[in-house]
Amino acid sequence: MARVTVEDCVDKVPNRFELVMLAAHRAREISAGSELTIDRDNDKNPVVSLREIAEETQSADALRERLIESNQTQIEVDEPEEDSMAMLMGGGQPDKPAEDDMSEEKLLRALMEAQGQP
């Protein structure tokens, strides 16, 4: 890698660690078949990616967004709430338990009857 290329890039991306991440991501994109925005000039992918960043044919912001998207494992999708989902499916009212007016005494009596005790 040419030192001049790295020093040119530091003007565009001041943080060297971020520069390494962006250049590596762009080099992987090139390896995967992405089109080059500059002439290769017999350079390897990491050098080409640094030259693209230095010449601003690849925006650092666009590269940063693509890097973030490539590292995401779960993409958030807006899903309706359960109450809204029931209404959308034709239920009208969301599922709720029926009103229960059973007192403690009635509950104990029902349990005893179920067990066969008087």
Curated annotation (Swiss-Prot):
Family: Belongs to the RNA polymerase subunit omega family.
EC assignment: 2.7.7.6
Reactions catalysed, as given in the entry: RNA(n) + a ribonucleoside 5'-triphosphate = RNA(n+1) + diphosphate
Xref: NCBIfam families: rpoZ (TIGR00690)
Keyword annotations of the record: DNA-directed RNA polymerase, Nucleotidyltransferase, Transcription, Transferase
SUPFAM superfamilies tied to this protein: RPB6/omega subunit-like (SSF63562)
Sequence segments annotated as region (Disordered): 78-104
GO terms classed as biological process: DNA-templated transcription
Species per Swiss-Prot/TrEMBL record: Dinoroseobacter shibae (strain DSM 16493 / NCIMB 14021 / DFL 12)
Gene Ontology cellular-component terms listed: DNA-directed RNA polymerase complex
MF-aspect GO terms: DNA binding; DNA-directed RNA polymerase activity
Name of the encoding gene: rpoZ
Coiled-coil parts of chain: none
Protein name: DNA-directed RNA polymerase subunit omega
Entry function: Promotes RNA polymerase assembly. Latches the N- and C-terminal regions of the beta' subunit thereby facilitating its interaction with the beta and alpha subunits.
Pfam families per record: RNA_pol_Rpb6 (PF01192)
Keyword Nucleotidyltransferase assigned: yes
Subunit note: The RNAP catalytic core consists of 2 alpha, 1 beta, 1 beta' and 1 omega subunit. When a sigma factor is associated with the core the holoenzyme is formed, which can initiate transcription.
